[in-house]
């Protein structure tokens, strides 16, 4: 009965708007970003709702990142690996190359922050099908999203 209104049937979309009102279509964007840096990026969560520019929380490809800095011991903590100049520079260069082809505000990546902790299935950051749950990641890591939009030196500024 249409008079009863609308019934929600399905999950809430991951898409959002930037502060400019421009829609960001997260699914395709995530795929494109990961593909552009697959050697060192396992997955990303796209942030930027109500912000001027997009940022990403980067879940690193640990093997690829370790390969970039072979001078670091194999048992060194991930935090040490992702803080290395080689990993930070490689990610910056790959994202800058991505931005050459994706320069609109809804696809251009302006900031990146590498994650030490992988997505947590117990915190619903991974779906039953093995995909990253964008909303859960951003909600659980709200402090890191805030850091992503700060002047913290760990944040990579991408041109």
Regions found by a protein language model. Name each.
Residues 1-107, 121:
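AMP-binding/adenylate-forming catalytic core of the ANL superfamily
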